[in-house]
Structures are given as structure tokens and as C-alpha cells.
A protein has these predicted regions:
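Gly/serine-rich nucleotide phosphate-binding loop at the start of the catalytic core
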Residues: 1-43, 48
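Active-site microenvironments in enzyme catalytic cores
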Residues: 45-167
Length: 167
């Protein structure tokens, strides 16, 4: 996870059930931020080593200490990205197809093509500074009459285009 420590700023953490160990405290260079970690030659193997060290750490936070709205003077969870762009892959849930057609007012042809395409439609979503973290506020356009909640699969890629993880 990423979390905010008021005295030191953004940190990477390793979650063990209901506790969090500060990985940045274990290795300030390799765990400086997500971008630094992803750029390592083998981020997965590196994190295995950090996790072994973290398992022995007595210095733990309870996850509840981080689970509240962001505030500069208190510890809180941050979005799980730092410098990465966010991209989406098509309209992938068949169940959402009609909702998207209805919402787009005449976008039937576009959404039919997205659903029936040989590969998913890739589209740019946002930059990191626009991402709301856990317990953060989201912005909805004032002219929006409704919002469609959708489940999402997130895939984390390294700069070398290796799949590092997913949620």
C-alpha cells in the first residue's frame, strides 16, 4: 500500500492481515516510491526480500490508523500509484452494455463496435494527481445526471511491460 506519514511524506507499506510495515523505512532507495520499485530489474523478487525483512519487523501500524479521509497532519492511505498514467480497456462487462448505450444518447454503434471488437478498446483515463485515494472525495461533473458504478480489474505493469500484479 501507499500511505502518508506526516513527518516524512509518502511511504510504501507491506500489509500483513491488519497491520502495515513501512517498507520505505526498510529500504529508502528501492522503496522510495512505486515508480522506483517498478523500475528495478526484478521488482517481484526484490519485494519478496523486503517482505521477508518486514515479516520480522516489530514496528507495525494497525491498518485502522490509516483508514480515514486524507488530512496532511495525520497518517492515511494514498492512491496505489505515484507517477503512472491510468489507462482503461474497453467496455468489458456484457451487463453494462445497455447502460453505456443509454448513457451515451445514440452511442449504440460505438459501443457495439467496442463489445464486438477482436481486442479491447484502450483509452486514456487520467493522470495520477487526479486519482482519488481510499476515503478521498471524487468529483462528478455538474451536468451529470447519473453515474454507473463498475467493477474494475487493475493490472500493474513495470516499465519493461512485465505484469507485476493485479487487483
Amino acid at each position: 500500500c501507499r500511505f502518508w506519514e506526516p513527518k516524512t511524506g509518502a511511504r510504501l507499506g507491506i500489509v500483513f492481515e491488519e497491520t502495515v510495515v513501512d517498507a520505505t523505512a526498510i529500504d529508502p532507495r528501492g522503496c522510495a516510491d512505486i515508480s522506483t520499485w517498478l523500475a528495478l530489474p526484478d521488482p517481484i523478487e526484490y519485494m519478496r526480500g523486503i517482505t521477508e525483512l518486514a515479516e520480522r519487523s516489530k514496528n507495525r501500524l494497525h491498518i485502522r490508523e490509516l483508514e480515514h479521509a486524507p488530512a496532511p497532519g495525520s497518517r492515511h492511505l494514498l492512491p496505489p500509484i505515484d507517477k503512472q498514467e491510468i489507462w482503461g480497456a474497453g467496455v468489458t462487462y456484457q451487463r453494462m452494455r445497455q447502460s453505456h448505450v443509454d448513457e451515451s444518447h445514440g452511442g449504440k454503434l460505438f459501443y457495439d463496435e467496442v463489445y464486438d471488437a477482436a481486442r479491447p478498446e484502450l483509452f486514456f483515463k487520467t493522470t495520477p494527481h487526479r486519482v482519488a485515494g481510499p476515503f478521498g472525495s471524487i468529483r462528478v461533473r455538474s451536468d451529470s445526471e447519473w453515474t454507473i458504478p463498475e467493477p474494475e480489474l487493475t493490472v500493474l505493469l513495470s516499465p519493461a511491460q512485465r505484469i507485476i500484479g493485479f487487483t
